[in-house]
């Protein structure tokens, strides 16, 4: 049985997600101790529970310790089965963090899958759904992943209610040496149950910030009605992204500029990937045939924690050379 220390490095939910995903794909049972030990509320939160439950269903796993607040679980997988699955997080828990747990196993399933997740599409401390769709999945398609993502409804904190459908076909993943891609900036500025000018002002502010620096941006707007109220903006170019969320009392212009500034910082780096993508791609590259290489704009503790889990499962397959990450 693989033993993982959940307090390693940043000690967050990413260790859990990567460990469960790799357990499903490799068929190796795993014990994860000290889950989220470095967080104010240690142990499993509702969101982690839902991700593990989904992985349990698709891999016919036996799981011990699956309850809120649990600081240790044992996950013993069977074989991964494709099919139609639904996950309702029940809160504004992030839909993309569920995908981080189950997308990798579904790429190695016995047949096509459709996964519909209800929860938060645009929430703090998680990749926005448009980033996952336009940056993460783009990088994974280069490896051979075949998946499509549809945003059916948006969900914001605290009510959630967003709905996203991910279609996955089993694929033979191959390593890629990624190069930086320079493209026009694209994006989406959205608001729900708010006046349409909120989305327009976010977009205009982001566009102006970038164009003042010689960067052209095409940003569409979405004005929606739904269960939850909120706004946000996501920008992307090649393998890099930037985003910001609206908050009560925060001017739309500030939201737009925050997103533009975060993308601009990434674009000023010579690296192929932004720091978040460098983290997210790692488990997929580890299970692909052949060698994957990319440079990251910043080496983070999140990446180091992910590498720790991968190397514990598979041997020393992830190496850092300065800001270059090599996976083979």
Curated annotation (Swiss-Prot):
Lineage, please? Archaea, Methanobacteriati, Methanobacteriota, Archaeoglobi, Archaeoglobales
Gene label:
rtcA
The active-site annotation reads 302 (tele-amp-histidine intermediate)
Q: Which family does it belong to?
A: Belongs to the RNA 3'-terminal cyclase family. Type 1 subfamily.
Gene3D superfamilies in the record: RNA 3'-terminal phosphate cyclase domain, RNA 3'-terminal phosphate cyclase, insert domain
**SUPFAM superfamilies according to UniProt:** EPT/RTPC-like
Offer one example of a GO biological process linked to this entry: RNA processing
Q: What does this protein do?
A: Catalyzes the conversion of 3'-phosphate to a 2',3'-cyclic phosphodiester at the end of RNA. The mechanism of action of the enzyme occurs in 3 steps: (A) adenylation of the enzyme by ATP; (B) transfer of adenylate to an RNA-N3'P to produce RNA-N3'PP5'A; (C) and attack of the adjacent 2'-hydroxyl on the 3'-phosphorus in the diester linkage to produce the cyclic end product. The biological role of this enzyme is unknown but it is likely to function in some aspects of cellular RNA processing.
Species of the source: Archaeoglobus fulgidus (strain ATCC 49558 / DSM 4304 / JCM 9628 / NBRC 100126 / VC-16)
Gene Ontology terms for molecular function: ATP binding; RNA-3'-phosphate cyclase activity
Q: What name has this protein been given in UniProt?
A: RNA 3'-terminal phosphate cyclase
User: Which coarse location class applies to the principal site listed for this UniProt protein?
Assistant: cytoplasm
Q: List GO terms (cellular component aspect).
A: cytoplasm
Top-rank taxon, per record: Archaea
User: What EC number(s) are associated with this protein in UniProt?
Assistant: 6.5.1.4
- What's in the keyword line of the UniProt record? ATP-binding, Cytoplasm, Ligase, Nucleotide-binding
Describe the reaction catalysed, as an equation: a 3'-end 3'-phospho-ribonucleotide-RNA + ATP = a 3'-end 2',3'-cyclophospho-ribonucleotide-RNA + AMP + diphosphate
Has the keyword Ligase been applied to this entry? Answer: yes
Question: Where does the protein end up?
Answer: Cytoplasm
Name the positions where ATP binds. Answer: 100, 276-280
Query: Broadest EC class?
Result: ligase
User: Entry's InterPro entries?
Assistant: RNA3'-term_phos_cycl_insert (IPR013791), RNA3'_phos_cyclase_dom (IPR023797), RNA3'_phos_cyclase_dom_sf (IPR037136), RNA3'_term_phos_cyc (IPR000228), RNA3'_term_phos_cyc_type_1 (IPR017770), RNA3'_term_phos_cycl-like_CS (IPR020719), RNA3'P_cycl/enolpyr_Trfase_a/b (IPR013792), RPTC_insert (IPR036553)
């Amino acid at each position: 049985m693989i033993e993982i220390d959940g307090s390693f490095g940043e000690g967050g939910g990413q260790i859990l997600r990567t460990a469960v995903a790799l357990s499903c794909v490799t068929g190796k049972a795993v014990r994860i101790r000290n889950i989220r030990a470095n967080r104010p509320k240690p142990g499993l939160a509702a969101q982690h529970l839902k991700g593990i439950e989904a992985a349990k269903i698709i891999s016919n796993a036996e799981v011990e310790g699956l309850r809120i607040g649990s600081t240790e679980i044992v996950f013993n997988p069977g074989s991964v089965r494709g099919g139609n699955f639904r996950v309702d997080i029940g809160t504004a828990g992030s839909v993309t963090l569920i995908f981080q747990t189950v997308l990798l196993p579904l790429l190695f399933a016995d047949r096509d899958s459709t996964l519909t997740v209800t929860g938060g599409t645009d929430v703090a401390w998680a990749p926005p759904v448009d980033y996952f769709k336009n940056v993460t999945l783009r990088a994974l398609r280069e490896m051979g992943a075949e998946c499509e993502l549809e945003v059916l409804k948006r969900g914001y904190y605290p009510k959630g209610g967003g709905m996203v459908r991910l279609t996955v076909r089993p694929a033979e993943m191959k390593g890629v040496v990624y190069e930086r891609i320079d493209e026009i900036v694209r994006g989406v500025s959205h608001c729900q149950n708010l006046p349409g000018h909120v989305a327009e002002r976010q977009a205009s502010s982001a566009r102006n910030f970038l164009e003042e620096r010689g960067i052209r941006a095409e940003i569409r707007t979405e004005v929606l009605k739904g269960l939850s109220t909120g706004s946000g903006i996501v920008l992307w170019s090649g393998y890099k992204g930037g985003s910001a969320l609206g908050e009560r009392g925060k001017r739309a212009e500030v939201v737009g500029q925050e997103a533009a500034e975060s993308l601009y910082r990434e674009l000023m780096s010579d690296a192929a990937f932004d720091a978040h993508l460098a983290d997210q791609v790692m488990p997929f590259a580890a299970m692909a045939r052949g060698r994957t290489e990319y440079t990251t704009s910043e080496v983070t503790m999140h990446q180091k924690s992910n590498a720790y889990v991968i190397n514990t499962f598979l041997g020393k397959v992830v190496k850092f050379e300065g800001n270059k990450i090599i996976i083979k």
